Amino acid sequence: MTEYQTIKFEQAGAITRITLNRPDAANGMDDTMTRELADAARRCDTEATKVVVITGSGRFFCAGGDLKSFASAPSRSRYIKGIADDLHRAISTFARMDAVLITSVNGVAAGAGFSFAVTGDLVLAAESASFTMAYTRAGLSPDGSAS
């Protein structure tokens, strides 16, 4: 089994559970997380997988892009492009795979986290869930397959 740094990937028979696991960063997406999500999506895109459940650890589903990692990247434009490319690959794979995708949204789903949350065939929102695009507040244009 592949070990991931920023997500938990658990398979039990035909069901896979993916947990975004950067609670100290509001499950914000950095280059490691988007690369791992793209790989996890590829692993789920099989006939053997019937259901994929995605959720977030801690108080947030996903706050979108990790703006701190964006700001500290040596080549900001190349870094953000890499994140967007991997995220789009993950979202595209999850959206077109035969397995049912359930997103279980706890807390905030913002920006790319919003786009990722609504990719689900079924979106389960806890009472704590809130959804916002939030791009203009960060001075960014929509990505994460939102446009």
Regions found by a protein language model. Name each.
Residues 21, 65, 106, 128:
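Histidine-centered beta-alpha loop that forms part of the nucleotide-sugar donor binding/catalytic region
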Residues 35, 56-93, 137-139:
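Glycine- (often His-adjacent) and acidic-residue-rich active-site loop
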Residues 1-57, 92:
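Conserved CoA-thioester-binding segment of acyl-CoA-metabolizing enzymes
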Residues 27, 56-58, 64, 105-107, ...:
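Conserved phosphate-binding and hydrolysis motifs of nucleotide-dependent enzymes
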Residues 18, 54, 66, 116-118:
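Hydrophobic/aromatic residues within transmembrane alpha-helices
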Residues 90, 94-98, 104, 110-147:
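CoA-thioester-processing core
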